């Protein structure tokens, strides 16, 4: 890696702008980083003026993080290749569906020894169905290592400077230290683990559970029911990782990327909010996305669809009744008030061996 590490943030939405506050401040303060941080911004017109110009003149992303100043060393760039070409660290923080196209644009245009880190909570569709981890797509396309950062990190609260934790999954200790230095702040505490796939899968699966929590809120079933859905969701997350990503550690689920992110998303995230409105309004998920999310995309329903494809392929739908029911509610195969009947006889209530005991050695 270069003497002075250049950093590029690929994305400038709500979360990308919030993380730019931390990354920009650290790049300016720490001698190992180049002070100037580029941030790729999809060009939009706001009241007739380019968003990149507004950000570079006012140091505020008025569309996605209004009211929060970005460090002046964070420079908005409307051209992806131009923003990324000198980067030693590429921070990917865009909706997951853009990643394959962005990787095509960047192929051969970035430093060959660069590293990436994905802050993207979601999967892409694998060829032939199922899920493809975003970090795997980035590594496969760009031929560079890709770590992940996931945690209980609601963007507006991070931007406010409220205390929280996050988890970096990185298999290379040397890169893990550099990434920790880049993201660590007094209010944003970082734990690095080597269980990268489990960290990333947690970041996507919790969005499915949050939809279930939203259905419970919309049905006004109360806190006990919501707590049960969250707990069963955690058990299905652990079970899913055990089936599809064997060798992961149980301890990872007790980091910020696991149980903490699950809780905060089930109480404060957009998947929960939209799912509650889905019950109370009678509108479709697509209609509510347009009305409520200011151009952002919901991750829970498409993730539930791909997870269901994988479960169906292995004949495991009955072992994951919560994930299965949430998918069927999102696709109108079931009504929201069918949710509780689907989980009343959950395998977790019948079979104490659902969580394989060997993992307990990893606590």
UniProtKB/Swiss-Prot annotation:
Substrate binds at residues 121, 270-271. Gene3D superfamilies: N-(1-d-carboxylethyl)-l-norvaline Dehydrogenase, domain 2, NAD(P)-binding Rossmann-like Domain. GO terms for molecular function: glycerol-3-phosphate dehydrogenase (NAD+) activity; NAD binding; protein homodimerization activity. SUPFAM superfamilies: 6-phosphogluconate dehydrogenase C-terminal domain-like, NAD(P)-binding Rossmann-fold domains. NAD(+) binds at residues 11-16, 98, 121, 155, 270, 299. Keywords: Cytoplasm, NAD, Oxidoreductase. Its EC number is 1.1.1.8. It is found in: Cytoplasm. One of its GO terms (biological process) is response to hyperoxia. It catalyses: sn-glycerol 3-phosphate + NAD(+) = dihydroxyacetone phosphate + NADH + H(+). Isoform GPDH-1 is predominant in thorax and isoform GPDH-3 in abdomen. Coiled coil: none annotated. Pfam families: NAD_Gly3P_dh_C, NAD_Gly3P_dh_N. Belongs to the NAD-dependent glycerol-3-phosphate dehydrogenase family. Homodimer. This is Glycerol-3-phosphate dehydrogenase [NAD(+)], cytoplasmic.
